Amino acid sequence: MSAAIDAVELSRELIRKPSVTPADEGAMDVVERTLAGLGFACRRMRFGEIENLYARYGTARPNLCFAGHTDVVPVGDAAAWSKDAFAADVVDGVLIGRGAVDMKSAIAAFAAAAAEAIAAGRVTGSVSFLITGDEEGVATHGTKKVVEALLAEGEAIDHCVVGEPTSAESFGDMVKVGRRGSINAEILVEGIQGHVAYPHRAANPVPVLVRLLAALQDRALDEGYPEFQPSNLEVTMIDVPNTATNVIPGTAKARLNIRFNPNHTGQALADWIAAEARKAADGFKGKVTVTPQISGEAFLTERGPFTELVAAAVKDVTGAEPELSTSGGTSDARFIRALCPVVEVGLVGRTMHQVDERAPVDEIRRLQAVYAAIIARYFA
């Protein structure tokens, strides 16, 4: 019989490892030791400087996977915290620490739920964990690489639960069944620097950049898509490195981000930005360079038995139906969708990445109960 796991104490042990991306600081060792103690076959997968772990209990199908990350964002102003960000103090029933919400407590909760299911003999197929140390960073050597390796090896994962903090206002009020895609673009306009009194001897990059950004901003990308918000474009930076009042600058730069629904693909949007750049630069003596970076495509896990199972498990614990949503930012679910249908369910995300990130202890235990209900229903 497997040993019981205290989800709160395991959360605290993980938080005490200051695993700010890309550092691991022993966090993955804690997860591996815990799962190995339950009888999981654990496999460390290191890509670059990033530690990853794939662990599986059982060899039969179906294989229900939990995906999460041990890395966390920086603390910020440590003096602004009421407690040490990595001390994992519990104050008035609330666990305070970086990773309490996003998302070390979810890893601990699913490990505790898995231990419970294994002890009760409920796992008639397999339960697995896909844990990375590269979700909060550039995410190139984490889940993406692990998924590519598992696909190449023919590892079968049938469904996946991601432990991101999906609850919006109250515990269990929201489950994520998809995500919008994301593309960043850097635009560099290179002109010819010169004196403002002699514009014919220069090529001002600023009007070109302004025309381009206006054209991009003025277009309504769409009016939404079933289950999705309308796509939106946001200019995130404009830089003209010129402090003189009598000089036409030589360069102008901007960055933008588009969060898009399935009406678009990242490549189609990159092509559109490039086409608009060519129009804005018509007759310009300089050069316009657009550098796009597609972070992920929009995806949706269609409503069906798996989404219904997860929603029912949440209702088992909260008594209320959760909203099935595609709102918010990107997550590693965008990579896992290549393996299997994926749903995200976790704690309330209100304090993630903030000073005094915190999670009520009772909500960590309720999350364990939700995960236990998912496992029980899955193998029923």
Swiss-Prot record:
Domain of life: Bacteria
Reaction(s) the record says it catalyses: N-succinyl-(2S,6S)-2,6-diaminopimelate + H2O = (2S,6S)-2,6-diaminopimelate + succinate
UniProt KW keywords: Amino-acid biosynthesis, Cobalt, Diaminopimelate biosynthesis, Hydrolase, Lysine biosynthesis, Metal-binding, Zinc
Residues that, per the record, bind Zn(2+) 1: H69, D102, E164
Pathway assigned to this chain's UniProt record: Amino-acid biosynthesis; L-lysine biosynthesis via DAP pathway; LL-2,6-diaminopimelate from (S)-tetrahydrodipicolinate (succinylase route): step 3/3
Disulphide bridges: none
Subunit structure: Homodimer.
CDD domains named among the record's database cross-references: M20_DapE_proteobac
Textual note on the cofactor: Binds 2 Zn(2+) or Co(2+) ions per subunit.
Record-given protein name: Succinyl-diaminopimelate desuccinylase
Keyword Zinc included in the entry's annotation: yes
Cofactor or coenzyme needed: Zn(2+); Co(2+)
Catalytic machinery residues: D71, E135 (proton acceptor)
GO biological process: diaminopimelate biosynthetic process; L-arginine biosynthetic process; lysine biosynthetic process via diaminopimelate
Family: Belongs to the peptidase M20A family. DapE subfamily.
Biological function: Catalyzes the hydrolysis of N-succinyl-L,L-diaminopimelic acid (SDAP), forming succinate and LL-2,6-diaminopimelate (DAP), an intermediate involved in the bacterial biosynthesis of lysine and meso-diaminopimelic acid, an essential component of bacterial cell walls.
PROSITE patterns: ARGE_DAPE_CPG2_2
Originating species: Phenylobacterium zucineum (strain HLK1)
EC number: 3.5.1.18
Positions that bind Zn(2+) 2: D102, E136, H353
